[in-house]
């Protein structure tokens, strides 16, 4: 087997291989790219590399992408690599070949890109990926080392209780205007992510670029919470990724079957949204750029986003365990899928200082829509 860099004319083969595999969990999902396969990566950066693992007969048996961007690491911004979309055919040979190719690849990219640190998110219920990558059986193999940076959950907000309290009356909640609000919004995002690992370099220009590169995202997507003095104290931007990536139900497993029946029954009372049948597409919004000064403001923004989305969609966001502000409020029905964010290091790379920091640290600046 050989590792090859994907090119634009590989788009069709990539989308076909990608659609054949499923993400395993409480609900097995099929992921499809309706447009160009690479559009998902351009949401985050124009600098990315997709690699194909091919057999001697040129059949694709594995893919993975590394996206490069500037991010904050302890005391400065530097280039990081985010490893995503790892798909390997379910054969021992393909898995072994991929892990053997991965370390030389990281060392090559470190030299070419000046990128010393790589990151990746893995679902904690994906046993095959966990055993192959995070907990390999042989410690003598020359493979990358995975160090847990933080644990988080993908929270799906499926419904709201009928007597849920309203948002705080002391807040002004409104939609943003790019010309009038993006400078103040960027300043707020910088304040909320200051000193946090993987933080972006927020500016008004950064936000405007996202409007240009995220299909369907406008300044009106941004919902601002302001105090009585007009200061921004929270924000969220619901966004539908269907133009670049869709998720459909391949199979419901275990408790998720009961959950679907319950949700669909409660949908008759308009307390929840209906969950789709097998083969149907999930209809949801990511809650992007989600920050709040306290849990009450977080609740108020979630309430407003839910009002805007219902009855056709549910809402999805990431909640890091160390961040109590973003825990799903009890007034909402929510399902959770556990994940971990890892730092991926070559065996030759020494342990960085940011991994030696106290175990309880602020949550990284992580945008679930870019997972």
Report the location of each language-model feature.
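A short helix-loop-beta-strand connector motif used in the catalytic cores of GNAT acetyltransferases and
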Residues: 38-52, 62, 211-223, 243, ...
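Non-catalytic interaction/regulatory modules that flank or connect domains
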Residues: 182-245, 307-312
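Conserved beta-strand in the GNAT
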Residues: 59-69, 82, 230-240
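GNAT/GCN5-related N-acetyltransferase fold signature
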Residues: 53, 66-68, 88, 225, ...
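Conserved acetyl-CoA-binding loop-helix of GNAT-fold acetyltransferases
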Residues: 88, 93-108, 295-308
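Short amphipathic alpha-helix that is part of the acyltransferase structural core
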Residues: 1-52, 60, 82, 158-206, ...
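Contiguous mid-protein beta-loop-alpha structural module that forms a pocket-lining wall or clamp
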Residues: 92, 101-201, 212-214, 218
